[in-house]
Amino acid sequence: MKGRIICAIASLLAVASTAYAQKNNDQLGQGSVVVTVVPDHSKEQSVNVTQQDIREIKVDGKDAQVTGFTPLHGANSPVELVFLIDSGARTSLGTQMSEISKFVQEMPPDTRMAIAYMVNGTAAFSGPLSSNPAQVLQALHVTAGPIGISASPYFCLSDLAKHWPSNNRSARRIVVMISDGIDYYDLRYDPEDPYVRAAVDDSVRNGLVVYFLYWADAGRISRMGFEQAAGQNLMLQVTDATGGYSYWQGFGNPVTFQPYLQDLRRRLANQFGLEFTTPLKENNAQIERLNLKLSAPSAKVDAPNRVLVHPASMAQQ
């Protein structure tokens, strides 16, 4: 009888342990982001940072556990890059065609690129992703659309995120937006702009890192300072959320994109894949706030402030 009682207790403990583990597994989330770490001094090409340099990582205000911190470069870290150009920029953007062409031609040979244009709330591609610069540049042309033809650049970004021209989720998905950032459906600055929030959510869900090159549309509205300030601040929300970067010099168009694109190449060469686990409130994928502190005193760190967290059990299925 005593032996039977012991066996029964052992069986109950085993069942309870399994149930507890399953419950905790269901509440455990995991995620990954791209982190950029560039040297403070432009003459230096890279910074030596490791997982041990991560001081703190919090997801939704809770401590997370780092499970991987890997340099992203070489053939084992493919890059897919899309230029998303505002069709309302018109002929004035023609002065930058040579710099865009040079950037495409100088990217590593395993980088797949494409050019899309903002048209009526969509990302309209003129060609497929390709590692052949000549093929990519066939799609590059001076835009000639009317002011506001993009409708909202954030509609276009959402469309691109939801219809990315590849199913390769192991590749870094880089977007280079050329626009004034103005939402023509709401010209004022609204930090809760629903189209911007949707663009952020769609970008985060689909793993996009967004970079913004400010270029003012030709026309009356784009010459008014408060709309320009609104556009820049809205785009800053997108780049901060996705771990990218915003480039501008006041409200005027830059003389050349060359320093921006040079800095972008440097950033792409100094990126790391950060993987982590964290408690998850619900048993489905959630977009949460991310806070990362990295001990790199001689470097600039750009990490997204939003991240998609999946249930660990989902990844195991």
What are these regions (language model features)?
Residues 1-4:
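Positively charged n-region of N-terminal signal peptides that target proteins for export
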